[in-house]
Design a protein with these regions (language model features):
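Positively charged n-region of N-terminal signal peptides that target proteins for export
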Residues: 1-5
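Sec/Tat signal peptide C-region and signal peptidase I cleavage site
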Residues: 15-19
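Flexible, solvent-exposed loop/hinge segments and secondary-structure transition points
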Residues: 20-377
Length: 377
């Protein structure tokens, strides 16, 4: 017992030393860090600033991006996709971030190895790595606190733009001077290149998908034409929902994990409140997915299964639903445009209530919300 007590003293001292080495404005600190036994993981405020800076740079460049920021355990801390981004843009952003995290080096390093020796690409993929530029470790005072991945835009390195350059400039603005980027190697010439004609598949100029909803609610214009869909929740509406829910949770003394997805189950916006752990984050995602798949709030099944537990095996095992409250399909003027899932308790105020506050802030009385019958005395 004496040695066990000594070990806890050493661990506590080590945590304090880390806390002193890392500026508190960049990492989870104080009692929240002690609660999760980690003084070295990027906080939500820093992740959001990096993402929003990169998004601003992309807007200035006239391009759209998707961005993922992971903590040093590989959990999603902040994710956002700009309007018009498709599935591949979004998933490759995460793959780049995860590659930078696992290798503790820029994902371009893996890409350069493949350029120099194409035979290593299969091994890289087998290891779960994505050998492409756009992922960078986030390092403060020689301590890795997370990783960032950016995808979705065509590189124009000679003109000073690429996904990687966007991430690098954003981190420089938020964190201070960053190490120089690795050399951009010229792509290896493809031997025996074929001459097969490649078809085009795009809408005629000026033709865009139509929606009865206002443009601030859904993807519109050229962005909608890129994905052939005018009824997907817009990036700005998703941000407004999440920020309102985040503030509501803070007012109730806690934090939340939030996922907002479109009707194709593609991530639009995500954030992990400081102190939230894997189970909070993952359940938020499962709630959003279940709400989308069932087109019902997850609280409906949660109540039904409490009333009749015999349905649990089918709901959980055969259908794969997650039946805790906190997931709501996003239905505006009768049109489903996405789904939200909230996990982590929202400071005791309730995950579903947090989601409801966010939805009301974004869509007012045009959004469909769960209504509970009055209890009889």
């Amino acid at each position: 017992m004496k040695y066990a007590g000594l070990l806890w003293v050493i661990l506590a001292f080590t945590g304090t030393a880390f806390a002193q080495n890392l500026p508190s404005q960049f990492v989870i600190s104080g009692e929240t860090a002690r609660k999760i036994h980690d003084f070295t993981t990027i906080n939500l405020a820093t992740a959001e600033r990096i993402a929003e800076t990169c998004e601003r740079l992309a807007q200035k460049e006239g391009v759209a991006i998707s961005i993922y920021i992971l903590d040093n355990d590989g959990n999603h801390v902040y994710m956002h996709r700009m309007d018009g981004q498709g599935y591949l843009n979004i998933v490759t952003a995460e793959m780049k971030a995860r590659t930078a995290l696992m290798g503790r080096e820029p994902s371009k390093s893996r890409m350069n190895r493949v350029i120099q020796n194409p035979d290593v690409e299969l091994q890289q993929i087998q290891l779960g790595l994505f050998p492409n530029s756009g992922g960078l470790p986030i390092i403060v005072n020689d301590q890795m606190i997370g990783a960032v991945g950016v995808g979705g835009s065509a590189p124009r390195v000679a003109q000073g733009w690429s996904d990687e350059i966007c991430a690098h400039k954003a981190m420089t603005e938020v964190l201070g001077p960053q190490p120089p980027l690795l050399e951009d190697l010229p792509p290896r010439a493809v031997s025996n290149r074929g001459n097969q004609p490649v078809p085009r598949f795009e809408l005629p100029q000026g033709v865009t998908p139509r929606s009865s909803l206002p443009s601030e609610f859904v993807v519109s214009g050229k962005a909608a034409a890129n994905i052939f869909d005018g009824n997907q929740i817009s990036s700005e509406a998703a941000k407004k929902i999440a920020r309102t829910c985040r503030a509501w949770a803070a007012e109730h003394g806690g934090a939340a994990s939030i996922y907002i997805i479109d009707t194709h189950e593609t991530f639009v916006h995500q954030e992990r409140g400081d102190g939230q752990v894997y189970t909070n984050i993952h359940t938020a995602m499962l709630k959003a997915q279940t709400a989308l798949q069932t087109r019902q709030p997850t609280s409906i099944r949660a109540a039904q299964l409490r009333n009749d537990p015999s349905g649990q095996p089918r709901q959980l095992m055969q259908f794969g639903f997650f039946t805790n409250s906190g997931g709501i399909p996003i239905v505006v003027d009768g049109e489903m445009i996405g789904a939200i899932g909230v996990g982590g308790g929202a400071g005791g105020g309730g995950d579903e209530n947090c989601a409801i506050e966010g939805l009301k802030a974004a869509f007012g009385n045009r959004v469909l919300l769960p209504v509970y019958p009055q209890q009889k005395d």
